[in-house]
């Protein structure tokens, strides 16, 4: 009985090596499934950075933090892309506009 089990294990290992040699991938069955209908989740819900770290006051002089929410062209990234909640997105927008007014951050560039 032990010999049969060891032979089966060796055969399985050989089969896996053959599959890898052919460039095929093994199927993965540990996918996250939706609890309601059993389908695969297509996106991961983003968590607000400020809510997670209990930040209530945003300083317009904190340029390093504000640059995370501004594109290279100078546009403010919308909340659906950066994952902030509505409350903190308003605070971020206000802080960015204040920083622009004082010339700490650039306005939009078209080039």
Swiss-Prot record:
Record flagged with keyword Transcription regulation: no
Record's GO cellular component terms: cytosolic small ribosomal subunit
MF terms (GO), sorted A to Z: small ribosomal subunit rRNA binding; structural constituent of ribosome
Keywords: Ribonucleoprotein, Ribosomal protein, RNA-binding, rRNA-binding
InterPro entries: Ribosomal_bS18, Ribosomal_bS18_sf
Any single GO BP term: translation
Biased composition (Basic and acidic residues): 17-32
Classification via Gene3D superfamilies: Ribosomal protein S18
Ranges for region Disordered: 1-32
Name of one Pfam family that matches: Ribosomal_S18
Keyword Ligase among UniProt keywords: no
Cited function: Binds as a heterodimer with protein bS6 to the central domain of the 16S rRNA, where it helps stabilize the platform of the 30S subunit.
Oligomer status and interactors: Part of the 30S ribosomal subunit. Forms a tight heterodimer with protein bS6.
HAMAP family reported for this sequence: Ribosomal_bS18
Matches recorded under NCBIfam families: S18
Family that this chain belongs to: Belongs to the bacterial ribosomal protein bS18 family.
Name listed for the protein in its UniProt record: Small ribosomal subunit protein bS18
UniProt organism field: Brachyspira hyodysenteriae (strain ATCC 49526 / WA1)
Lineage: Bacteria, Pseudomonadati, Spirochaetota, Spirochaetia, Brachyspirales
